[in-house]
Amino acid sequence: MVRASGDKLVSLANMTALSALIGLPLIFFVPLPSREVWGLLALTTLLHTGYKIFLVRAYAHGGLGHVYPLARGGAPLLVAGAGFVLLGETLSPASLAGMLLVTLGIISLAFRKNGGTQDEKRATLYALITAGFIASYTTVDGIGARLAETSFAYVAWLFVLDGAAFTALALWRRGPGAAWSPATLLRQGLPGALLQVVAYALVLWAMTKAPLGLVSAVRETSVVFAALISSLILKEKLGPMAAIAALAVAAGVILIEG
């Protein structure tokens, strides 16, 4: 949705603003965060904002089939590593094998076509930075959801704070007249906002029941659908090696589930 839009910053801000509006009424029915959780919410708001900034930059230089597998497929390795270091979560041999597949898939995507054009190199760099932000906020949010009274309370506050921060940034960068009409908001942002809120609420709930790396890995199986969308709908030329790499990343994250 963001990749196919004209102004990607405004499109992402539309979706984020609507996510905040969805979360806003919910905060009146959930407990206030503790001081510890407030700190995590402040940190993750910065991380979510950084993620969106670099995602927009990545899509400015590369296609969905190149950027999305790198950004999303790279995160489970980092999340699993953080889970081991911070929480003592261990991985099965199958999970380790999955990580190897993910790594090989990422390398294949990052260095295809003899290194790629200058734009592709920039897209690769920004996508890998995006993966770092995804892994960071996923880890922080997983810990925050466990510390909060309920994971859904954490999600409600997260979307309100994240939406306020990124919308303010987008207004500062683009101004109040840049496609902020109600019709534009609803058309560009509502479907993505609803999916984002529901999906991430389920992800954080799952992270209170299972290791962070495993949940993150299952979430990132969407790289296969992104590869298909980029080829069939956006008409991006992936090439056989890129398609195989995307499938390798998907197979890897399934193995990580163990």
Where are these regions (language model features)?
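Hydrophobic/small/kink-forming positions within alpha-helical transmembrane segments
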Residues: L24, T45-I53, G73-G81, A135, ...
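Juxtamembrane helix-loop-helix junctions in multi-pass membrane proteins
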Residues: M1-L18, S136-L161, L214
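Membrane-interface interhelical linkers
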Residues: V2-L46, G50-L64, F111-L128, F159-K209, ...
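Helix-coil boundary and interhelical linker segments in multi-pass alpha-helical membrane proteins
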Residues: L26-G39, V79-S95, I143-F152, W205-P211, ...
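Specific alpha-helical transmembrane segments that line the substrate/conduction pathway
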Residues: L43-H48, A60-I107, A153-A156, V160-L161, ...
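Hydrophobic transmembrane alpha-helices of multi-pass small-molecule transport proteins
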Residues: A17-L18, G23, A80-F84, A94-K113, ...
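Small-residue-mediated transmembrane helix hinge/kink sites in multi-pass secondary transporters
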Residues: R3, V56, G83-F84, G142, ...
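C-terminal structured domain segments across diverse proteins
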Residues: K209-A210, S216, F225, I229, ...
